[in-house]
């Protein structure tokens, strides 16, 4: 009989400063960081409102003047807009009057935004346009004479874009966006975003687990051919393929994983070790979902590139995705898959990208297992705040990068995380 999962509850001792990483190389991670409300709140200030650039949109989502999109930086609601002069703007979706969310639509086009509560209105850059009855009426008093609309706009974020990816930050101290992305990561972003894109749509899902468990997951090539039967059985991602597992050199928080077929038989190791994720008896009725149209100098079957803290760039065969991670508390996050193609795609290639969208997303043949795994970790660790994970794979050769049998990217991530959080 299948067990019913108990509700997740937070660890009893909840002090954000009471977090101890026993090793400084990221190989031991206290489970408290996945369930503590205090740690989560500290992350909102030190990471999402700290010296990071947060992915908020694809420029292709807001191509025209007045286009807007509601999203989040961490758990702070923000709106990203295209201004009348074609520039990008982002502001906190919180009215300067009494704090209500101003914009209640997920996306659209508007020349201004009006708060439903008291009808204060703002332009696309967050500047206050109007206050009803500001000067009173028929002798009744209004706002004080010294009320200055210029001082009561919406809180603005700094915005920049790289190759059509839009990022926002609360910080005045963060490095310029190209430097933040880093010299090692930019060429891999350029690989995918080398020409204008077309936005195809998105899927959304929630996972009852901590957002960092997903960040671990996308930095973990070791799991990819163990957990995912589809990956391994249909030769999309296997041990033995040409591989890269590269962290960024600045802080270790970004990374790139790629695999490419070489023509060698990579199934033998799975057969010999009787690994569950390889199943020769598993067949597809329509194998066209596995078609691979050559588009790049190297036709990787898998390109997974986390850009900390909210973005994962993905290419699996010909499906292209910008995954957006939105924390919703210590034990919940929203995951949005933004699907895109290139503006000059043929109708046939566009149709293939849409078909291959079934590989990922909430019911994807591959990715549905990832959030199931992160929820299992969440449920398994919630009552053992002081216990730690063991992240040892390839620790004896941490600089090796031509392998997927490694947890080096996860260790680098945790080292960078500790520095940001002050642990």
Swiss-Prot record:
MF terms in GO: 2 iron, 2 sulfur cluster binding; anthranilate 1,2-dioxygenase (deaminating, decarboxylating) activity; iron ion binding
A Pfam family matched in the record: Ring_hydroxyl_A
Domain Rieske: 53-168
Upregulation: By anthranilate but not by benzoate or salicylate. Expression is positively regulated by the transcriptional regulator AndR.
Catalytic EC class: oxidoreductase
Cofactors demanded by this protein: Fe cation; [2Fe-2S] cluster
Transmembrane regions: none
The enzyme's E.C. designation: 1.14.12.1
Binding residues annotated for [2Fe-2S] cluster, in chain numbering: 95, 97, 115, 118
Positions bound to Fe cation: 223, 228, 370
Cofactor binding notes: Binds 1 Fe cation per subunit. Binds 1 [2Fe-2S] cluster per subunit.
InterPro entries: AhdA1c-like_alpha_C, Anthranilate_1-2-diOase_lsu, Rieske_2Fe-2S, Rieske_2Fe-2S_sf, Ring-hydroxy_dOase_2Fe2S_BS, Ring_hydroxy_dOase_asu_C_dom, Rng_hydr_dOase-A
Pathway the protein contributes to: Aromatic compound metabolism; anthranilate degradation via hydroxylation; catechol from anthranilate: step 1/1
Keyword terms: 2Fe-2S, Aromatic hydrocarbons catabolism, Dioxygenase, Iron, Iron-sulfur, Metal-binding, NAD, Oxidoreductase
Gene3D superfamilies: Naphthalene 1,2-dioxygenase Alpha Subunit, Chain A, domain 1, Rieske [2Fe-2S] iron-sulphur domain
GO terms for biological process, alphabetical: catabolic process
Known role: Oxygenase component of anthranilate dioxygenase multicomponent enzyme system which catalyzes the incorporation of both atoms of molecular oxygen into anthranilate to form catechol. Can also act on benzoate and salicylate but not on 2-chlorobenzoate or o-toluate.
Family label: Belongs to the bacterial ring-hydroxylating dioxygenase alpha subunit family.
PANTHER family: 3-PHENYLPROPIONATE_CINNAMIC ACID DIOXYGENASE SUBUNIT ALPHA, CHOLINE MONOOXYGENASE, CHLOROPLASTIC
Subunit-structure text: Part of a multicomponent enzyme system composed of a reductase (AndAa), a ferredoxin (AndAb) and a two-subunit oxygenase component (AndAc and AndAd).
Protein name: Anthranilate 1,2-dioxygenase large subunit
Gene name linked to the record: andAc
